[in-house]
């Protein structure tokens, strides 16, 4: 039944596109890629020299990834140098859309963290592959790569396979993050000029709620004055940690209302959150970070966080799960296989858990990028989505942030009524809820948590395609 409906979605989209460490680091910190492996992993492929010297065809040919057994997806991978002084390099893995790649939008995916590898998004959420416990590669039923050309980048420098040779090569602000990503994108579209004419979207989840607006703002600012213009059409952010102040201020009440805190625990949590917000207002960034870390994450705190102690759970990504699903970490072992490393051109380069990235971005953890998001909402298509079951950036906390934003549609947004969203008219199940004002779409997806495409792959697939291809939110005929 599900496959039949999936075929219906695909057929509709075929017609549609035919011509005419921080706060959210725990899930990534638990994914450890061993640096010990046997066999020939090949050599890292650095593509910037090919780009600089105009050897485009050779660079494309060298970056092509050998297909995995049973798979036939075309893809390209390698390193782009974004700072020669510090030898800072960003790793990318690019999948042209299976369907009409010559016209399909190019979608950049950025994982959160800070320090979470976008390989998590590729293997766990919406890439073409799923890794099983015995290291078998199987095809995903609802890959975003079916209709979209997906560009996965390990970001910032020092995340996953991305690396730098100097401590000054690490980002310490969102400006640094955006600058490195912009450099990578300009080089990427030079290496793959056939995709430079296509619409471009910046997407991500969680802490990427900072990266995405930062990069979009950077592109928006530079496009008018640069010869090469990136065809930015919009952004999409899942469970967006964009404005920490408004989110943190709502934690205690939300956790109490869903039964994870009792009355006394709520009072303590609220007191600490209020203190954290006070420090944010005073720009005492490290003091605010330390309070938040002790309350929620426990990355630099000795022992468990307050949240972990009182709930008994390490997983704050889905209210129905107390620990992280084991299958979310299978890809880590896969990335140690020498034949895989050789195929994606990383050689014996270490895979970082992002701890050093988080260290350099600690002050950034509690800073807001709300002005940049407001700017983007004034000019481009924007999708902000939440999983109904998320805890750490819950739908209610996102709405708390959105209600506090000032953009040209803010008044209309506050008055707008949300509508029920179903994928098919015959569905008994509701996929979620949508509130739309102009080019802005806010979506809550039922039955999913923070790692939404993992929990609800079909609904996520439908959502991203409705948004990017402007299909609206009316249900399809069965």
From Swiss-Prot:
Keywords: Carboxypeptidase, Glycoprotein, Hydrolase, Protease, Signal, Zymogen. PANTHER family: SERINE CARBOXYPEPTIDASE CPVL-RELATED, SERINE PROTEASE FAMILY S10 SERINE CARBOXYPEPTIDASE. It comes from the Eukaryota. Residues 1-22 form the signal peptide. It comes from Mus musculus. It is an enzyme of class 3 (hydrolase). Belongs to the peptidase S10 family. Its EC number is 3.4.16.-. GO terms for biological process: proteolysis. Glycans are attached at residues 83, 134, 309, 350. Gene3D superfamilies: alpha/beta hydrolase. Pfam families: Peptidase_S10. GO terms for molecular function: serine-type carboxypeptidase activity. The active site is at 206, 390, 450. May be involved in the digestion of phagocytosed particles in the lysosome, participation in an inflammatory protease cascade, and trimming of peptides for antigen presentation. This is Probable serine carboxypeptidase CPVL.
């Amino acid at each position: 039944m599900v496959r039949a409906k999936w075929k219906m979605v695909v057929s509709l989209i075929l017609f549609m596109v035919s011509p005419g460490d921080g706060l959210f680091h725990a899930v990534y910190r638990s994914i450890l890629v061993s640096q010990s492996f046997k066999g020939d992993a090949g050599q890292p492929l650095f593509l910037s020299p090919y780009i600089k010297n105009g050897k485009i065809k050779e660079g494309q040919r060298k970056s092509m990834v050998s297909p995995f057994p049973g798979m036939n997806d075309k893809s390209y991978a390698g390193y782009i140098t974004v700072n020669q002084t510090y030898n800072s390099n960003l790793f990318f893995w690019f999948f042209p859309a299976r369907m009409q790649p010559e016209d399909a939008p190019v979608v950049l995916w950025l994982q959160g963290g800070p320090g979470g590898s976008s390989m998590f998004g590729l293997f766990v959420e919406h890439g073409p592959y799923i890794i099983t416990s015995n290291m078998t590669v199987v095809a995903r039923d609802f890959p975003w790569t079916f209709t979209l050309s997906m560009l996965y980048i390990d970001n910032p420098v020092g995340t996953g396979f991305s690396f730098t040779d100097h401590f000054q090569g690490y980002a310490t602000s969102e400006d640094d993050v955006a600058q490195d990503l912009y450099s990578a994108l300009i080089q990427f579209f030079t290496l793959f000029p056939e995709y430079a004419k296509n619409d471009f979207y910046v997407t991500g989840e969680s802490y990427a709620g900072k990266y995405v607006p930062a990069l979009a703002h950077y592109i928006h600012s530079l496009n008018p004055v640069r010869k090469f213009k990136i065809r930015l059409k919009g952004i999409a952010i899942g469970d967006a940690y964009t404005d920490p102040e408004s989110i943190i201020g709502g934690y205690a009440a939300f956790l109490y209302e869903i039964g994870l805190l009792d009355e006394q625990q709520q009072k303590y949590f609220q007191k600490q959150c209020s203190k954290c917000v006070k420090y944010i207002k005073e720009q005492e960034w490290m003091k605010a970070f330390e309070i938040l870390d002790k309350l929620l994450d426990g990355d630099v705190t000795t022992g468990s966080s307050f949240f972990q102690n009182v709930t008994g759970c390490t997983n704050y990504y889905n209210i129905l799960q107390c620990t992280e699903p084991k299958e979310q970490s299978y890809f880590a072992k896969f990335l140690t296989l020498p034949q895989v490393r050789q195929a994606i051109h990383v050689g014996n380069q270490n895979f970082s858990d992002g701890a050093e990235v988080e260290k350099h971005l600690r002050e950034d953890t509690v800073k807001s990028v709300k002005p940049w998001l407001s700017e983007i909402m004034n000019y481009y298509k924007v999708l902000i989505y939440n999983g109904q079951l998320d805890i750490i950036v819950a739908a209610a906390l996102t709405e708390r942030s959105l209600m506090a934003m000032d953009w040209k549609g803010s008044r209309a947004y506050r008055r707008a009524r949300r509508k029920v969203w179903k994928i098919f008219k015959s569905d008994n199940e509701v996929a979620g809820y949508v509130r739309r004002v102009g080019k802005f779409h806010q979506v809550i997806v039922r039955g999913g948590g923070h790692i939404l495409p993992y929990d609800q792959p079909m609904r996520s697939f439908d959502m991203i395609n409705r948004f990017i291809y402007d299909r609206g939110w009316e249900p399809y005929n069965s």
